[in-house]
């Protein structure tokens, strides 16, 4: 499995206040541009966060200069720092892409005549080996038992809801209480891939955990800002980060000796478990919100090889 990139701690609210005013003004114009282009909120957040990190590096190491004054060597210096701090190839490509997109915007608005990132060669794409896990019924049972022992209702709900709804991690991260119909066991108008609004369907186990979590939040008087899943960094506008849910997933995987477990595995596993239990491929595909059953069959269903081998044994060839 590909090793996750090391996290570099740039964030500092005091330093953000000291960032070159011209850089902040240009960033604000870029925010408006992204909003007009209707980029997903998560995409805008990721771009802004990456640019803040770069601005803080400029503040600390390059005399807080304007991005309009920087040359390709200055940007290369920042990228070299990130590489030495442990960022992997995929993370480095993201950093280059974000800075390049920002400069393309500045060039389009005639703040610049050239994009200095054009002179920087991106690292070659690494070959990532991603372990795809299809949880067995036995592993799901073990997961439930371990999560009961840890007494973390939010973590239990995350695992059970992800498996039951088979929703993508980006959708899970943005769920709000007011979308949930407890009686019908449906979560309405969930923003999914390509901007589609879909409904998610959950089981009785999830329904009980939702009620339990709601009661715990009420007793503790915690302000979750309306989000189903939250941490102390959430606000009215900012939901939980996907990276936090990935950490939760890794923790769950360690409980059941599946260290490679990642959020999308709940989606694969739920689909395969339903198919092997007798649900039609067409119905599974609908629940996954796929355009066709071909995608479902090729990437989301693990064939029951034991059953196929048993059938094969009936033929004496």
Which residues does each predicted region cover?
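Conserved tyrosine-mediated DNA breakage-rejoining catalytic core shared by Y-recombinases
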Residues: 165, 174-209
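Short, polar N-cap/turn motifs at the start of nucleic acid-interacting alpha helices
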Residues: 180-182, 259-260, 279-299
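C-terminal catalytic core of tyrosine-transesterase DNA break-rejoin enzymes
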Residues: 160, 164, 267-290
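N-terminal core-binding DNA-recognition domain of tyrosine recombinases/integrases
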Residues: 10-13, 28-130
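Active-site/catalytic core of tyrosine-dependent DNA strand-transfer enzymes
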Residues: 203-258
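Basic, Lys/Arg- and aromatic-enriched nucleic-acid-binding interface segment
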Residues: 128, 140-169
């Amino acid at each position: 499995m590909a090793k996750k990139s090391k996290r570099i701690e740039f964030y500092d609210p005091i330093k953000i206040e000291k960032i070159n005013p011209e850089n902040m003004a240009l960033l604000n114009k870029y925010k408006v541009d992204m909003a007009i282009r209707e980029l997903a909120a998560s995409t805008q957040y990721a771009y802004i966060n990456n640019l803040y990190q770069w601005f803080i590096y400029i503040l600390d190491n390059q005399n807080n200069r304007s991005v309009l004054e920087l040359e390709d060597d200055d940007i290369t210096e920042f990228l070299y720092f990130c590489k030495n701090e442990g960022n992997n190839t995929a993370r480095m490509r993201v950093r280059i892409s974000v800075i390049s997109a920002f400069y393309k915007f500045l060039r389009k608005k005639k703040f610049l005549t050239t994009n200095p990132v054009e002179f920087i060669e991106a690292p070659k794409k690494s070959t990532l080996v991603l372990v795809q896990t299809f949880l067995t019924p036995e592993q799901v049972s073990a997961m439930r038992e371990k999560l009961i022992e840890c007494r973390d209702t939010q973590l239990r709900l995350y695992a059970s809801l992800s498996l039951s709804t088979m929703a993508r991690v980006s959708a899970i991260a943005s769920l709000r209480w007011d979308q949930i119909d407890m009686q019908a066991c449906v979560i309405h108008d969930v923003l999914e891939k390509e901007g589609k609004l879909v409904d998610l369907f959950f089981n009785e186990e999830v329904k009980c955990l939702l009620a339990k979590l709601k009661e715990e939040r009420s007793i503790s008087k915690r302000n979750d800002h309306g989000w189903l899943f939250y941490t102390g960094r959430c606000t009215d506008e900012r939901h939980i980060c996907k990276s936090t849910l990935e950490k939760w997933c890794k923790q769950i995987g360690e409980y059941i000796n599946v260290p490679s477990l990642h959020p999308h595995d709940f989606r694969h596993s739920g689909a395969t478990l339903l198919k092997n239990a007798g649900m039609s491929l067409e119905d599974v595909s609908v629940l996954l919100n796929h355009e066709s059953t071909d995608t479902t069959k090729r990437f989301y269903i693990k064939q029951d090889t034991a059953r196929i081998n048993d059938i094969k044994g009936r033929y004496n060839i």
